[in-house]
Amino acid sequence: MYFVHPQIKLKELKKVNLSERLPFYFPGKQIVFTDMGRSAFKIIAENLNLQGSDLLMPAYICDVFTPVLQQYNIRPVFLDIDLKTFHIKKEEIRKKITKKTKAIFICHTYGLPFDVDALRKELQGFQKISIIEDCAHAFGAGVGNKGEAAFFSLYKQFPTVRGGILVCPKDWQVSLPKTSFNLRDFVSFLNYFPAFAFLFKRYGSEIAPKVVRREKMPDPASLNKRSLCLFSRSLGYFEKSLEKRKELALFFQQELKKLGFEVQEDKGNVFCLLSALVPKDLQDKRDEIVKELRKHRIFCIRIWKDPIVLDKERFPNTFEAAKRVINFPLQNHHTKKDVNKMMAALSYILKKK
């Protein structure tokens, strides 16, 4: 069985000292663990005084930020994306800056680092515009240090159930209330084990309605101790196996290209989500392909398949990506044999289309 979300290998859970390890990733920065990544974004919005301002951001992004933007009266100014990177089009940035623009929100989409240095040059000559890095998919990609602030979403890459990291200047005063690991968190934790994950995928909607993972408090809060412990015990194996993951992802991409898929650029990519666009002649059958793969116990996803923008003419690439993207399973413990099994199933399905 193959799943996109992180899976637990018990023998690889070895605790590391986070207070010693994390400064290596974020030198000279303050590191704050939050209940969720969006909690960290709220703290950033407050400390950068974004209330009532314009925020440049990708049109191809999760709708989870919408309530935060509304809460702080921030007007999103959307930019279309490049289909090879899934990043915002740099050529659109200058055209979209307004007198009320205080920040630009960039996303290291699917694990591919966005060139923040090039963005700095692009912003020269404008009033002070802060750069906010959305690193939800990109822990280990060397990102999070070049903007005014950054945030990570731990459970996208680690079996932590929930959790975010705020990376910000040391002079920010951040004090957060504590949270606890509850029953719903425990049920979510079981999803990191393949047998339970399969049962949840197969019967979950019959047992209980799907509930979006939300913050435990209306205001930003800290990460519970059990999730923090899971992160500390997963980080060592993540670091040790990251290069193997990258190598396997490149092999996976080459196999996908043989079937006509268009793959994301790979330079610096940590492949949190190995994502590809189905061939254009099959784009109307993308959802059928995903459903057929489930019969082979290959559980792909299609994140952001429903664009948060409505104007297809202004954001053509965003709509195309939403219609064609498939996010394939890739775990750090997978091998080429696993990839070959998935590709054999995919090839069989495509031949019937």
Where are the language model's segments positioned?
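Short, conserved charged micro-motifs
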Residues: 174, 281-289, 334-340
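Conserved glycine-rich beta-strand-loop-beta hairpin in the small C-terminal domain of fold type I
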Residues: 6-8, 221-242, 246-253, 263-277
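Active-site C-terminal subdomain of aminotransferase-like
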Residues: 171-225
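Conserved PLP cofactor-binding pocket of PLP-dependent enzymes
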Residues: 188-191, 266-269, 286-325, 348-351
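Conserved PLP-anchoring active-site segment centered on the Schiff-base-forming lysine
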Residues: 44-99, 292-293
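Conserved PLP-binding active-site segment in aminotransferase class I/II-type PLP enzymes
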Residues: 1-51, 72, 237-240, 347-353
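Active-site phosphate-binding strand-loop segment of PLP-dependent enzymes
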Residues: 84-175, 331
